[in-house]
């Protein structure tokens, strides 16, 4: 079910990126600023507001920290990683 959750969120996002975040996360704020600076849209799901979702996303990606970011452009769902990976990816 874990991958199904991510795929369902990606399917309904209608944005360039899908991002899972947490409260008080400086890297999440930095990712939002990065997307804004490049005029890229994103859909955000905050783990603190959706109990149980973190376990599904970790099971699907193996990525245990936030943010967890996916590129949805070109009709594909591509896991990028966290802020550092996304910053390098968008250079």
Regions found by a protein language model. Name each.
Residues 71-91:
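Non-catalytic, surface beta->alpha helical segment in thiol-disulfide oxidoreductase systems
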């Amino acid at each position: 079910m874990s991958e199904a959750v991510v795929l369902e969120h990606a399917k309904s996002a209608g944005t360039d990126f899908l991002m899972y975040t947490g409260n008080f996360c400086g890297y999440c704020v930095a990712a939002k600023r990065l997307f804004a600076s490049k005029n890229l849209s994103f859909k955000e799901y905050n783990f603190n507001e959706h109990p149980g979702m973190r376990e599904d996303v970790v099971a699907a990606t193996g990525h245990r920290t936030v943010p967890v970011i996916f590129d949805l452009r070109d009709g594909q769902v591509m896991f990028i990683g966290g802020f550092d990976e996304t910053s390098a990816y968008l250079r």
